[in-house]
């Protein structure tokens, strides 16, 4: 009688129970497996029953029902045949994979041979590369605008510029009125003489939303 072993891993249990079956190549009933295998392996009957099911799932142990009883058996040749079948299956799969690779390689080579170099294709490739370069530049530029301090600086510059434009507009308007009252120079003649456009007007403060948009210009009274 073998000494009971404790702490065997599932793989060790399967190996020990398989060894029990292969030691005498006998067909066992459920009761015989649980009692005799328990003595041989040092496992409890419950452990033997659980391990037996794992070996059945692995295809190492065969089982069949005769009458009201289940019988179990496993011969060394079973494992050999199982491994042999797996080798055959994997060999077949490898062969099919190689054939697919060869087939796809031929298709690729055929497509390459059919692809005719032309001036149009060359230009399109150059255009594509240019677009890729532009896209990269735009992305780099967008990263600059992700800097909040830079955005704040731009907003401040815009406000200063608008204030300056409105100051100059005020000065021009005052000078136009002065020339009209002092020298009887009509505003239209004044504008023509100094190249001032008829639509010159004050600028309204800029609205800074999530996406800055210019506000329509309105005339100041």
From Swiss-Prot:
It holds the Pfam family LZ3wCH. GO terms for molecular function: double-stranded DNA binding. One of its GO terms (biological process) is reciprocal meiotic recombination. InterPro entries: LZ3wCH, Mnd1, Mnd1_HTH. One of its GO terms (cellular component) is condensed nuclear chromosome. Keywords: Coiled coil, DNA recombination, Nucleus. It is found in: Nucleus. Residues 89-146 form a coiled coil. Belongs to the MND1 family. Required for proper homologous chromosome pairing and efficient cross-over and intragenic recombination. This is Meiotic nuclear division protein 1 homolog. It comes from Dictyostelium discoideum.
């Amino acid at each position: 009688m073998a000494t009971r072993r404790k702490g065997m891993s599932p793989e060790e249990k399967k190996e020990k129970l398989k060894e029990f079956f292969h030691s005498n190549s006998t067909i066992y009933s459920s009761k015989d497996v649980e009692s005799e295998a328990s003595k041989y392996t040092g496992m409890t009957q419950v452990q033997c029953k659980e391990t037996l099911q794992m070996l059945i799932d692995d295809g190492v142990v065969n089982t069949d029902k005769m009458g009201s009883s289940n019988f179990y058996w496993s011969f060394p040749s079973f494992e050999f045949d199982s491994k042999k079948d797996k080798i055959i299956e994997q060999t077949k799969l490898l062969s099919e994979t190689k054939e697919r690779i060869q087939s796809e390689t031929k298709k690729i080579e055929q497509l390459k041979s059919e692809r005719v170099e032309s001036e149009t294709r060359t230009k399109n490739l150059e255009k594509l590369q240019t677009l890729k370069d532009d896209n990269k530049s735009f992305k780099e530029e967008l990263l600059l605008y992700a800097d909040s301090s830079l955005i704040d600086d731009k907003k401040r510059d815009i406000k200063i510029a608008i204030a300056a434009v409105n100051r100059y507009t005020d000065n021009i308007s005052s000078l136009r009125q002065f020339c009209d009252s002092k020298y009887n120079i009509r505003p239209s003649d004044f504008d023509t003489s100094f190249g001032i456009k008829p639509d010159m007007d004050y600028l309204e403060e800029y609205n800074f939303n999530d996406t800055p948009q210019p506000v329509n210009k309105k005339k100041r009274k």
